[in-house]
UniProtKB/Swiss-Prot annotation:
Pathway(s) where this gene product acts: Carbohydrate degradation; glycolysis; pyruvate from D-glyceraldehyde 3-phosphate: step 3/5
Pfam family of the protein (one): His_Phos_1
Catalytic activity line of the entry: (2R)-2-phosphoglycerate = (2R)-3-phosphoglycerate
The entry's keywords: Gluconeogenesis, Glycolysis, Isomerase
Protein name (record): 2,3-bisphosphoglycerate-dependent phosphoglycerate mutase
InterPro entries per record: His_Pase_superF_clade-1, His_PPase_superfam, PG/BPGM_mutase_AS, Phosphogly_mut1
Subunit: Homodimer.
Site entry (Transition state stabilizer), positions: 179
Cited function: Catalyzes the interconversion of 2-phosphoglycerate and 3-phosphoglycerate.
Protein family per UniProt: Belongs to the phosphoglycerate mutase family. BPG-dependent PGAM subfamily.
Binding positions (substrate): 8-15, 21-22, 60, 87-90, 98, 114-115, 180-181
């Protein structure tokens, strides 16, 4: 069976501050770095031969991958970085404290923005402090100004099908270091999770989700490598 390891980046500075991060390039905290290294130590003990890796173009995911690979003694592994694996864009919520936003707009409204499948937050204003239109990593890209989980899946899925799935079908054990929502989108696709329940699936930081896939990329087993920090798992399809 081919193995796929999904790693949500370690704790970021804005995770710690309870802020909506999205596409903003918040870096890892010291705890996040430790989580990334711990992920690598856990993956080093897995009976797998990881030969390919993918990340977003966001620093917290890239550094999580590199710190994990360092512990695995696999820094030579070819890694492809692509914006299609970026976190969901939180639009006008970017940079806001989640608790303060709930106090201002009401918990019910913020819950809709955060947890509905197809309702995005208000768009980010052009020229905002968090406008990334001049960031060189996004040159030539039509950057979204907000996203729902559905539109996040709409950009993640073609990349999965074109770039990641072919290697897995060929039997290449693969690692992906990305973000809560881009990984949630992949889990939805792989496990056929319904729209109404996928938003409730929590993926912890720095705890690899190891999935074994058959030749048709159907999951046959799934587990978190750190059982003490594990969250609920999707049902096998």
């Amino acid at each position: 069976m081919t193995k796929l390891a999904l790693i949500r980046h370690g704790q970021s500075a804005w995770n710690l501050e309870n802020r909506f991060t999205g596409w903003w390039d918040a870096d890892l905290t010291a705890q996040g770095e430790a989580e990334a290294r711990h992920s690598g130590k856990l993956l080093a003990e897995v009976d797998a031969d990881f030969r390919a890796g993918f990340t977003s173009v966001q620093t917290r995911a890239i550094r999580t991958m590199w710190l994990a690979l360092t512990e695995m003694k696999r820094v030579w592994l070819p890694i492809e970085k692509d914006w299609h694996l970026n976190e969901r864009h939180y639009g006008g919520l970017t940079g806001l404290n989640k608790a303060e936003t709930a106090a201002k707009h009401g918990e019910d409204q913020v819950h809709v923005w955060r947890r509905s499948y197809d309702i995005p937050p208000p768009p980010l204003e052009v020229g905002s402090t968090f406008d990334l239109s001049t960031d060189p990593r996004y040159r030539g890209i039509d950057i979204p100004n907000t996203e729902s989980l559905k539109t996040t899946l709409d950009r993640v899925l073609p990349y999965w099908q074109q770039k990641i799935a072919p290697g897995l079908i060929a039997g290449t054990d693969t690692m992906i270091a990305a973000h809560g929502n881009s990984l949630r989108a992949l889990v939805k696709h792989l496990f056929n999770v319904p729209d109404e329940t996928i938003t409730g699936l929590e993926i912890p930081t720095g705890n690899p989700l190891l999935i074994e896939l058959d030749p048709n990329l159907k999951p046959v087993s799934v587990r978190y490598l750190d059982a003490e920090r594990a969250h609920s798992l999707p049902d096998l399809p």
